Amino acid sequence: MCIRDSHNTSRLHLCRTQFYGRVLWDACINGSSELMTNLSMSLVNILYNFQLLRLAGENGVAAYGVIMYAAFLFVAVFVGYAVGSAPIVSFHYGACNQAEVHNLYQKSLRLIAVVAVSMTAASMVIIPYVARIFVGYDAQLLALTSRAFRLYALSFLIMGFNVYASSFFTALGDGVTSALISFLRTLVFQLAALLLLPALWGIDGVWLAVTAAELAALAVSVYMFVTKDQKFHYRHG
């Protein structure tokens, strides 16, 4: 029912709306990957701090804090591109423009590969300078942070593909696949790596946990890219 005045000639009117529960549910499912990412961060950070306190004391926690601040600058590049390109993918998929979806998919993977290598190389160069800004007052802590950052930065080679995979399936309306990638990547694989790797390599295992988790998640992302192509047809246009 529309509420309109007899003298109102506008095409826009106030109307009594309906509650579309199915649409709301689908939107929640499609955005569940972002929910899982944010929920898992707290749990993973708690375990990181626990392991670092056990293996390296307060210096380990301080080094981790520096790494998180610096790493966010690199991770933001991947997240920004994935989130920014998602509406374009959604638009062309909704318009049944499979050729353009294929084009976006192929070019995005190539771009992410180039950026991943470039950022990893850049991070290796700037690590000493970034660490010195935060912990230059302590030579031992500076050495620990620099080494930790170098090990952690290896994850930049892989991370972008997983971030993009999760966002890409969200853009296609496949929230379940997107959430699965995000859940495994940010919680399950990281928790497993944080529990297993320190037992093998000590504190280096803590710094390598994120790379191991991203590598395992990459296998899942590749599997989903291959199998879901039968439904969405983005690999061959």
Regions found by a protein language model. Give the residues of each.
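Short alpha-helical transmembrane segments in multi-pass integral membrane proteins
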Residues: 4-32, 89-155, 196-237
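Hydrophobic faces of transmembrane alpha-helices in multi-pass small-molecule transporters and flippases
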Residues: 16-47, 52, 73, 77, ...
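Hydrophobic alpha-helical transmembrane segments in multi-pass membrane proteins
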Residues: 34-46, 50, 79, 111-124, ...
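Helix-terminus/linker motif at the lipid-water interface of multi-pass membrane proteins
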Residues: 39-69, 73, 91, 96, ...
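Alpha-helical transmembrane segments of multipass membrane proteins
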Residues: 46-51, 73, 121, 164-168, ...
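Small-residue-rich hydrophobic transmembrane alpha-helices
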Residues: 63-127, 159-181
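Short runs within selected transmembrane alpha-helices of multi-pass transporters and secretion channels
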Residues: 79-82, 152-171, 177-187, 193, ...
